[in-house]
């Protein structure tokens, strides 16, 4: 059965990724390369961004569930699956050969509320290591790409707008919560762009043809 096969494939990939990531998090490392830019110091800490940051998890899960159980287009499922697998693989390789970390998390919080309490919990469970490129950024963009390129969702403007808004807020949250440096975000976005060019080439070629067609039409009208 197609759904069963997709489930098995996703479970196997996720299990391998979790095991390898756990190894990278706990392996002995003599020194980490510190990731930091001056832009990180300009971005203020804002605990309210914990909301979109945590929404990343249901956003990912619900999108994957949709492509496994509800979307009948096998090609679109594999576009998303291979894109996510590519990003995770690059992330694991980078983390292995280039151990990295950041020191931009605040030691004191400007306010005391439920949002800062959740951030404190996040800091206690998520180490500031292996952050380059940002998987939060890459996966959010990969999910957004899959939804906007889904044939059955082509006319669902609300879903596309909601996905775009949430993706933008998730990316911003990684910086405002001091979970990632600007470099991590840029590298995650670059990796997502690479994935788009590789796994959605038809969309790229169609866009290029549209631009060329408009240019030819404009020149004809001028003549």
Predicted regions and their residues:
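Membrane-interface loops
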Residues: 24-38, 70-153, 207-211, 215
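Membrane-embedded catalytic cores of phosphoryl/pyrophosphoryl-handling enzymes
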Residues: 120-209
């Amino acid at each position: 059965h197609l759904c069963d096969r997709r489930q098995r494939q996703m479970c196997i990939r996720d299990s391998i990724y979790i095991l390898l990531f756990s190894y990278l998090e706990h392996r002995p490392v003599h020194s980490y390369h510190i990731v930091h830019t001056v832009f990180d110091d300009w971005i203020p800490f804002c605990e309210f961004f914990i909301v979109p940051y945590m929404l990343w998890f249901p956003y990912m899960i619900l999108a994957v569930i949709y492509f496994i159980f509800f979307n009948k287009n096998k090609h679109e499922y594999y576009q998303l699956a291979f894109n996510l697998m590519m990003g995770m693989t690059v992330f694991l390789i980078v983390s292995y050969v280039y151990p990295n970390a950041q020191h931009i998390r605040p030691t004191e919080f400007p306010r005391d509320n439920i949002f800062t309490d959740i951030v404190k919990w996040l800091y206690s469970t998520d180490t500031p290591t292996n952050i380059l490129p940002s998987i939060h950024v890459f996966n959010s963009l990969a999910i957004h790409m899959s939804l906007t390129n889904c044939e059955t969702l082509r006319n669902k403007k609300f879903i596309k707008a909601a996905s775009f808004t949430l993706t933008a807020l998730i990316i911003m949250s990684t910086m405002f919560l001091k979970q990632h440096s600007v470099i991590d975000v840029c590298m995650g976005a670059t990796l997502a762009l690479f994935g788009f060019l590789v796994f959605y080439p038809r969309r790229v070629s169609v866009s290029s043809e549209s631009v060329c067609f408009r240019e030819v039409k404009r020149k004809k009208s001028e003549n």
